[in-house]
């Protein structure tokens, strides 16, 4: 795949296949991630790879609880006429918000089915910004292997 095609067409894939990801592809994705640039070349990151079904289920419960809290807070703030969440949104914007929210809600309910979770952890960097290129490299590598990410 041409690099520009990947840059222009990669999107968040919240609905992914449940097929296991082979170890060699996981290693390729992580290898791509750790080659990313970082501030002062500190490479101040760790990646936690989770494929175990039981651990994914436990993380799924945490994710679902967090999503429920987030979406309920968002919806409650939207009810407040002075809130900025949905203030001055036209119908197209509201439809986009609903579509994204529905997709994210689906992921929250089906998170345990995602075959691979990669948790990107930043050490000693309160902004976390140095890890972003590494995550993007990982996502592009996944895309190169035909795997969706979000």
Q: How should each PLM-predicted stretch be described?
A:
Residues 26-30, 60-63:
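A generic alpha-helix structural signal
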Residues 31-35, 102-105:
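Glycine-rich, charged/polar anion/phosphate-binding loops
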